[in-house]
């Protein structure tokens, strides 16, 4: 946002800005094979502690993170309506009640006050490091003591792939609004090695196949919602922090350009220069 404002201020009426939802997001990835994160109560407590709605307001002022959403892009054709989204663990608007529940789950799971764990993150200033700082603060609100470990991309990815982490900050960036593309990240790790959360869930794998083969749109949406509830809430395997927002400043003489949700597939068919 600040860079957008600088461009507009410098170029004045010679520039214009287009914004759009983005098929990218930040994911919180607990290591489902490492104690105590092998206990779904602990994983659920971590997501309950995150104030996504407050974080959206704050982080959208300093980063391109912003929209709150589930497994499908907010604003997209398969997006979960807010009334349904807020029923998922960690996506409700009453953060005080959510954190009270998070503390209860941690106590029930035997996690002591001040429990220390590492949060491994990518050494990229935007948006990974602000996301990590925010998450560390959120988890401290429920009595945990996370340590933010920032790594170069090579060691960071090697640790995620090897399971050498407690909690990781991951991401997805896709090219098309379709459940076949967005949901594959969450099928069992032995079916998709890009699922770093290290779990096996044949029910999820079956739901993925079902929705992919379903021709009726409404029935497909129902299966996608069932998949989403299991991943993000019922089992809390891994979950989104926030989705990203595309901000594209360009010269006004660039005509016919329409910003879309993917930076991989731009629609340039009708682009032309007015001078």
List each model region and its residues:
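Extracellular/periplasmic solute-recognition and catalytic clefts
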Residues: 1-34, 57-58, 171
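Long beta-strand-rich cores associated with HINT superfamily self-processing modules
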Residues: 248-275
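Ligand-site clamp/hinge motif
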Residues: 1-6, 10, 44, 133-136, ...
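Short, well-ordered beta-strand elements
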Residues: 114-124, 147-149
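Extracytoplasmic/peripheral linker and loop segments enriched in polar/acidic and small residues
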Residues: 41, 69, 89-96, 145-156, ...
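Structural transition elements
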Residues: 66-107, 125-128
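Ligand-binding "clamshell"
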Residues: 3-18, 162-165, 178-193, 251-257
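Periplasmic-binding protein-like
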Residues: 33, 37-79, 95, 130-131, ...
């Amino acid at each position: 946002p600040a860079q957008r404002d600088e461009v507009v201020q410098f170029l004045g009426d010679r520039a214009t800005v287009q914004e759009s939802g983005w098929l990218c997001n930040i994911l919180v990835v607990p290591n489902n094979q490492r104690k105590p994160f092998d206990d779904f109560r602990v994983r659920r407590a971590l997501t309950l502690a995150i104030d996504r709605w407050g974080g959206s307001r704050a982080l959208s002022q300093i980063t391109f993170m912003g929209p709150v959403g589930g497994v499908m892009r907010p604003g997209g054709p398969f997006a979960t309506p807010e009334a349904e989204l807020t029923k998922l663990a960690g996506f409700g608007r009453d953060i005080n009640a959510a954190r009270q529940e998070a503390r209860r789950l941690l106590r029930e799971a035997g996690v002591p006050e001040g429990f220390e764990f590492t949060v491994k993150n990518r050494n990229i200033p935007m948006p990974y490091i602000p996301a990590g700082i925010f998450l560390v603060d959120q988890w401290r609100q429920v009595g945990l003591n996370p340590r933010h470990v920032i790594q170069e991309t090579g060691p960071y990815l090697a640790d995620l792939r090897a399971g050498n982490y407690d909690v990781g900050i991951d991401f997805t960036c896709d090219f098309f609004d379709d459940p076949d593309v967005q949901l594959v990240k969450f099928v069992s790790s032995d079916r998709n090695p890009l699922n770093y959360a290290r779990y096996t869930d044949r029910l999820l794998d079956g739901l993925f196949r079902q929705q992919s083969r379903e021709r009726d749109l409404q029935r497909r949406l129902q299966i996608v919602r069932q998949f989403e509830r299991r991943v993000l809430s019922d089992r809390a395997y891994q979950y989104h922090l926030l989705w990203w927002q595309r901000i594209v400043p360009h010269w006004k003489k660039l005509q016919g350009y329409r910003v879309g949700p993917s930076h991989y597939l731009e629609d340039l068919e009708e682009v032309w220069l007015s001078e």
